[in-house]
Swiss-Prot record:
GO biological process: fungal-type cell wall organization; proteolysis; single-species biofilm formation
Active site: D108, D294
Function: Secreted aspartic peptidases (SAPs) are a group of ten acidic hydrolases considered as key virulence factors. These enzymes supply the fungus with nutrient amino acids as well as are able to degrade the selected host's proteins involved in the immune defense. Moreover, acts toward human hemoglobin though limited proteolysis to generate a variety of antimicrobial hemocidins, enabling to compete with the other microorganisms of the same physiological niche using the microbicidal peptides generated from the host protein.
UniProt KW keywords: Aspartyl protease, Cleavage on pair of basic residues, Disulfide bond, Hydrolase, Metal-binding, Protease, Secreted, Signal, Virulence, Zinc, Zymogen
Organism of provenance: Candida albicans (strain SC5314 / ATCC MYA-2876) (Yeast)
Gene encoding the protein: SAP5
Induction: Expressed during development of germ tubes, pseudohyphae and true hyphae. Induced during host infection.
Protein name per UniProt: Secreted aspartic protease 5
Catalytic reaction equation(s): Preferential cleavage at the carboxyl of hydrophobic amino acids, but fails to cleave 15-Leu-|-Tyr-16, 16-Tyr-|-Leu-17 and 24-Phe-|-Phe-25 of insulin B chain. Activates trypsinogen, and degrades keratin
Leader sequence segment: 1-18
Regulation (activators, inhibitors): Inhibited by pepstatin A analogs.
Reported pH dependence: Optimum pH is 5.0.
Residues at which Zn(2+) binds: E268
Subcellular compartments: Secreted
Length: 418
């Protein structure tokens, strides 16, 4: 999850709940299922929390049919267009404690701490639709009911890029994931949060929000002999798919084309690699920068110069929504790819359509202009709309990330990472 203030968008989220897991020697596999629910989990703006967002177009800014009309709109006046955006979160079922208390948590490569809501947590409403005990609807933790619970009497405090936060105390207890049990796992038991569910951060130890480094889940899985390396692979599948997969300690060789290409991680705290250039429909943009590969971020973020070149290449135009936020739109039929060139001659090609999202007339009919799902930021982040086109292996031990073009298939050929 992007740990920096960013402009986010009103969202229909795709909540991905962990399906039954398969356990194999040397690795732990979790399969994810996709379902839609109306939330706006990445929206820090007050206006977006209160009402839907709109764009206004004049008739000259969109095509009309032979009669001079396009369903609901007259050529003589402007038209309001509703913004509906999707966010994707990847969640897994875990158990905590000797009594196997069940919780569902977001799996996040952009952070490093596991935290879960206490059974008496105070849920602080932040987004539209947050009511009652919304923050523990996916489960909560009762230390008193677990014989193996240990209160470390150390405070925990974390804040995410969308403005959500979690506060509590550090505990140790048994954590079950993917059919295995991790003993004495350190995590935060949270008594106050504005987030909708707990988060399982699986990044570097140095990225932990605590004042000291500890063994987070990937490290514990390795140290307790469950996996051979503190590493995991991520397969998000296609945008239309209903399943995805993360494998701790393993790689599915059936899920990518060609060979995996190793890239050194360029940060001590974040899972970043070097990006050399971006080619947009034949227009090359020098990047020479580091990018974070973040499963907890739905869209992608770049510095201003990269964003402007991408927008120009796809013919985007700037608009302002009803809350005053800057929005870029482009023809929904824009074809071609955006090619990301990394070191060691690795190229990942992403369809332009991955960076476009449908807008709608207020009647619900699709509008011919789509929102461009790229944002300006001081940091460069490749989110889910990039990661769906790549098979990514995060190796925390060897400080490298390996990637290859994704292959969408139901076939499987899993090997352990040694």
């Amino acid at each position: 999850m992007f740990l920096k203030n960013i402009l986010s968008v009103l969202a229909f989220a795709l909540l991905i709940d962990a399906a039954p897991v398969k356990r194999s020697p040397g690795f732990v596999t979790l399969d994810f299922n996709v379902k839609r629910s109306l939330v706006d989990p990445d929206d820090p703006t007050v206006e977006a929390k209160r009402s839907p967002l709109f764009l206004e177009f004049t008739p000259s800014e969109f095509p009309v049919d032979e009669t001079g009309r396009d369903g609901d709109v007259d050529k003589r006046g402007p038209v309001a267009v509703t913004l509906h955006n999707e966010a994707i979160t990847y969640t897994a079922d875990i158990t905590v404690g000797s009594d196997n208390q069940k919780l569902n948590v977001i799996v996040d490569t952009g952070s490093s701490d596991l935290w879960i809501p206490d059974s008496n947590v105070i849920c602080i409403p932040k987004w539209r639709g947050d009511k009652g005990d919304f923050c523990k609807s996916a489960g909560s933790y009762s230390p008193a009911s677990s014989r193996t619970s240990q209160n470390l009497n150390t405070r925990f405090d974390i804040k995410y890029g969308d403005g959500s936060y979690a506060k509590g105390k550090l505990y140790k207890d048994t954590v079950g994931i993917g059919g295995v049990s991790v003993r004495d796992q350190l995590f935060a038991n949270v008594w106050s949060t504005s987030a909708r569910k707990g988060i399982l951060g699986i990044g570097f130890q140095s990225g932990e929000a605590t004042e000291f480094d500890y063994d987070n889940l990937p490290i514990s899985l390795r140290n307790q002999g469950i996996i051979g390396k503190a590493a995991y692979s991520l397969y998000l599948n296609s945008a239309e798919a209903s399943t995805g997969q993360i494998i701790f300690g393993g790689i599915d060789k059936a899920k990518y084309s060609g060979s995996l290409v190793d890239l050194p991680i360029t940060s001590e705290k974040k899972l970043t690699v070097g990006l050399r250039s971006v080619n947009v429909r034949g227009r090359n943009v020098d990047a020479n920068t580091n990018v974070l590969l973040d499963s907890g971020t739905t869209i992608s973020y770049f510095t201003r110069s990269i964003v402007r070149n991408i927008l120009y290449a796809i013919g985007a135009q700037m608009k302002f929504d009803s809350a005053g936020n800057k929005v870029y739109v482009a023809d929904c039929k824009t074809s071609g790819t955006i090619d990301f060139q990394f070191g060691n001659n690795l190229k990942i090609s992403v369809p332009v359509s991955e960076f476009l999202f449908q807008t709608y007339y207020t009647s619900g009919k699709p509008f011919p202009k789509c929102e461009v799902r790229i944002r300006e930021s001081e940091d460069n982040i490749l989110g889910d709309n990039f990661l769906r086109s790549a098979y990514v292996v995060y190796n925390l031990d060897d400080k490298k990330i390996s990637m290859a073009p994704v292959k969408y298939t139901s076939e499987s050929d899993i090997v352990a990472i040694n």
